Amino acid sequence: MRFSGKQILVTGAASGLGLAIAQAAQTEGAAVTALDRVAAPFDNSRICDITDEDQVRSVLSGLDRLDAVVNSAGIARRAKLGDTELADFEAVMAVNLRGSFLVSKHALPLLRQRGGSILNLSSGVATTGLRNRAAYTASKGAILSLTRNMALDYASDRVRVNCLCPGFVNTPLLSSLPPERRARLTALHPLGRLGEPEDIAHMALFLMSDQASWITGQAIAVDGGFNIGHADDV
């Protein structure tokens, strides 16, 4: 198993992509530390508000080694910029950006001891935009820049930093869409289907593994070809 004996920390591990990545890592032999605001289904599950530095510091200080970090926790608010309340904008930035910053900052001393990997979750819409998601797309665009800068800063410490840019994945949010909207969205994907959480987890594990030892500072789209053009005729 690729991660036998490895210690991996995953944020947002109670649901969605974080849960899928944490489960896949555990299946491959990793000892997973799962962080979320609610309990996650793992032996070492810690309730932690990643926007609170004291809580993050407390969790990380209790670990004696770490091989990889997955910054998967994220939230969104539906609104155009002019309709976005400051509190909502700050809440999205706090979880999506500040949380990734704080977890990475306090994980780095452990990762630098023997080398390791940080994997951030951005989004396919970070570079294209998405109507009514001003705060979300801004936060995910910032994750792209943060990833590249971290990769430059810590390459000499043998800490690789990459990010995934998932497309439209079957999560509870998409599952709630009316069937006709799901059908229209699916038709925009050259590969003819929406993503599954496992699609993202497979790439996440590759990027954290020794097989990706010469990959850093990269943003990898996992989106069924959505970002290369739409499959329907015009």
Residues covered by each model-derived region:
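Active-site loop immediately N-terminal to the catalytic Tyr-X3-Lys motif
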Residues: 82, 128-134, 156-157, 192, ...
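Short C-terminal tail/terminal secondary-structure segment
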Residues: 128, 216-234
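C-terminal helical subdomain
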Residues: 163, 185-215, 222-224
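Residue(s) in the substrate-gating loop at a strand-loop-helix junction
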Residues: 123
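Active-site helix of classical SDR
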Residues: 104, 139, 147
